[in-house]
Amino acid sequence: MEALAAAGLMALYRPPAAPVAVVREVFEILAGACGVTFFVWVQHHAPVRMLARSANESLPARYVENLCTGRMLGGVAFAYLRRPGPPAVVATPVAGGYRIDGEAPWVTSWGLAALYAVAARMEDRVVFFLVDVEPPTPSLRASPPLRLAAMNASSTVRLSFDGLSVPEADVLSVVAFDEWQAEDRMATAKPNPAAFGIAAACIRLLGDTPLAAELDDCRARSYALADAGVTDDGHLAALVRARAQGLDLAVRAATALVTATGGRAMGLDHPAQRLLREAAFFTIQAQTPALRHATLAQLSRS
């Protein structure tokens, strides 16, 4: 993280944000080099992006400089909003702000990040707010780091909120839940550059392979769809299929690398097994029902 900060990469989304083509290239390079470093780093940008859009004008002055210089690492907790059933984390209005209760099942960078952007349901709305976790508070309780098949160094925990007090001054936004869902459907349908980065890393290690041309074609088609600026249901479905194709390609490229490497690939010090585990992780990261179905359909054809 210190090296990425020194390179200016903690400020990638500081207004004016870097061009989308540059962002994608950086994502691909970092994901191919080390998936867990990429994952911790990419979540850091969520608070920066949300601060840039927040109507709470006092918040950027408090946090943007430290986040964008890397003096403070950011994290995020909101994926549970996609889950059906009762809300995992709930906001209750109180005098001067909100009371937060519930459990976030996956919170990355615990012990590394100091500032988290968190979401909580409030009936048909979502409250997004910032939590500075330093110093510790009794109303936040983290589990021991979860043991994971991939991204094990990400220090991912379950985080319990027990009457956490969030003042209005720390609120980023309050939006309708269906509005957030519509925005999230589009965001999770877009191509994942990390999948292309993993595929590219595997292809470099493989050498001459037809997968290289397939990667070029898949990347070009996926990014063209994402840049088309169309939001109708048909285009959204095409985006989801393209994302699934990219995920499938990453898994196949990593499997090919393991196969070509042979028994040495089973050593934990060999990149082939790591790339395969990371490719598997990205097949479920930010997964929606539509993406799950599209990915399963794509895998059945491969």
Predicted regions and their residues:
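Glycine-rich flavin
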Residues: 1-101, 106-108
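C-terminal helix-coil-helix/basic helical segment that borders enzyme active sites and/or dimer interfaces
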Residues: 14, 215-269
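Predominant activation on well-ordered alpha-helical scaffold segments within soluble catalytic domains
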Residues: 24-28, 48, 196-204, 247, ...
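Buried hydrophobic positions in well-ordered alpha/beta secondary-structure cores of metabolic enzymes
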Residues: 26, 100-102, 161, 199, ...
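A generic structural signal for well-ordered coil/turn residues at beta-strand boundaries
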Residues: 72, 85, 112-114, 125, ...
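DPxDG-like acidic metal-binding loop motif
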Residues: 103-135
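Glycine-rich beta->alpha junctions and the first turn(s) of the following alpha-helix
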Residues: 143-223
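Glycine-rich phosphate/cofactor-binding loops in nucleotide/flavin-utilizing enzymes
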Residues: 264-302
